[in-house]
Each structure stands twice: as structure tokens, then as C-alpha cells.
């Protein structure tokens, strides 16, 4: 049974990560599906475009907890089943992958910024805090949330290797960072083209589209917008 424990923990992490709280919160609060407007990305930033700040904050918090809770549970109770920090790191990676490609939501997930932050804070609070501070500094200077996320993701494995050494969990952190940067490919193109939206600036809506509004029953649908945005 101990041989199966790591695989069961990783699977549980992925399934928990597959809970798309952007979609769930929006449904519970009577808002449009975040995959149907704005960037089409089910994340807190896109939910904020609905105009409902409470829904956006709830999405942000739950997405972060989605990465934090599975890792914390393994760290607290895993030793009884022979699971250590390395397993916890890969459980966190699995939760992050679940957010990116959620099995319960047709594999249409977000970009994982909040979930990655939750994973890092649970694995190593100092590393998590350093990474978040990097995000804040870059965002404050350049006013680009996507750029801040990309830079913070790039620095996270660097901090781990420089301060704590090349431990096995560096592999999980590095993989998470690479995936996060890759998911921001569209944002990178916009940054290079000078068309990326700054913090506090509404993303321009494609011509002929209406702003998001609450759902109006089962048959109502919203047109999907082209492009990808930061989440």
C-alpha cells in the first residue's frame, strides 16, 4: 500500500486542482461563464472583467488554496504513509497541472498563477514570500500583471537553487515555472507588440461584442473572444 501512496496522493492533487473555481464561483453568483468573455481564461483576472470584485477575490483565494491545501495535507499527514517533502512538491505540481487542464471542465483551465503561489507558500513559506515579493516589485514598476507573473515564475527555481540548493523538489518547482511561462505565450507576444493591458486598465473588447453580464437561463450563450489573457 505504501508503494501506491505517492501515486494516490498525486492523483488526488490533480483532481483537486481540476476544480475550476472561476467557473464554479461565477455559476453560484449568477455570473457569465468566464470562458465565454474577455480572454476566455477561467481565472481571477478574467472574472474581475465581469465587474464583480467579490467573485474575483473569491476565485483568487480558492485558486491559491487549491495549491496550498493538498501540499499542506501531505506535509502534515504524509509521513504516516512514508510520504515526504518531495512527494508534497509533486502533489503541488499535480494540483497546478489540474488547474491548467481540469478533467472536470473539458481541460479548459487557467494559467495557474494563484495556484502556483499556493504551492510555493505551502512547500516553503520563505520561497513563496520571495516569489510574491518579486511579483509585487515588477508589477509596481511596470504595471503589467502578466510580466510580473512571468518574471516571478522565472525567479522561483533560481531562488530555490541559490538559497536551499538543488534539492529534488527543484524539479517540481522548475516544471511548474516552465509551464506557467509557456501558458503566458500570448501575453509575451502582446508585451513585445506593446498591446498588453496594464494593471487597472480594461482589456479592449473585440468589435461587435457585448460586455459580460449575468447568465439568463440555460439556453443563453456568450460569444467567445479571440486571444488569450493573463489569469
Regions found by a protein language model. Name each.
Residues 12, 16, 21-68, 100-114, ...:
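Interhelical loop and helix-boundary elements at the membrane-water interface
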Residues 48-52, 74-78, 112-142, 154-164:
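Interfacial segments of multi-pass membrane proteins
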Residues 1-9, 69-90, 121-127, 160-172:
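Helix-coil boundary and interhelical linker segments in multi-pass alpha-helical membrane proteins
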Amino acid at each position: 500500500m505504501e508503494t501506491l501512496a505517492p501515486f494516490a496522493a498525486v492523483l488526488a492533487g490533480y483532481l483537486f486542482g481540476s476544480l475550476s473555481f472561476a467557473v464554479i464561483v461565477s455559476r453560484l453568483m449568477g455570473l457569465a461563464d468566464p470562458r465565454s468573455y474577455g480572454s476566455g481564461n477561467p481565472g481571477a483576472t478574467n472574472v474581475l472583467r465581469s465587474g464583480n470584485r467579490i467573485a474575483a477575490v473569491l476565485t483568487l483565494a480558492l485558486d491559491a488554496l487549491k495549491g496550498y491545501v493538498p501540499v499542506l495535507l501531505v506535509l502534515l499527514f504524509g509521513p504516516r504513509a512514508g510520504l515526504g517533502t518531495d512527494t508534497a512538491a509533486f502533489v503541488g505540481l499535480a494540483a497546478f497541472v489540474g488547474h491548467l487542464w481540469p478533467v472536470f471542465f473539458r481541460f479548459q483551465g487557467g494559467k495557474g498563477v494563484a495556484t502556483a503561489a499556493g504551492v510555493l507558500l505551502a512547500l516553503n513559506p520563505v520561497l513563496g514570500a520571495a516569489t510574491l515579493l518579486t511579483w509585487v516589485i515588477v508589477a509596481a514598476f511596470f504595471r503589467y500583471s502578466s510580466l510580473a507573473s512571468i518574471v516571478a515564475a522565472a525567479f522561483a527555481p533560481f531562488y530555490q537553487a541559490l538559497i536551499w540548493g538543488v534539492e529534488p523538489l527543484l524539479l517540481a518547482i522548475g516544471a511548474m515555472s516552465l509551464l506557467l511561462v509557456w501558458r503566458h505565450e500570448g501575453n509575451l507576444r502582446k508585451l513585445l507588440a506593446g498591446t498588453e493591458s496594464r494593471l487597472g486598465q480594461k482589456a479592449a473588447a473585440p468589435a461587435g461584442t457585448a460586455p459580460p453580464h449575468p447568465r439568463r437561463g440555460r439556453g443563453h450563450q456568450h460569444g467567445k473572444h479571440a486571444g488569450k489573457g493573463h489569469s
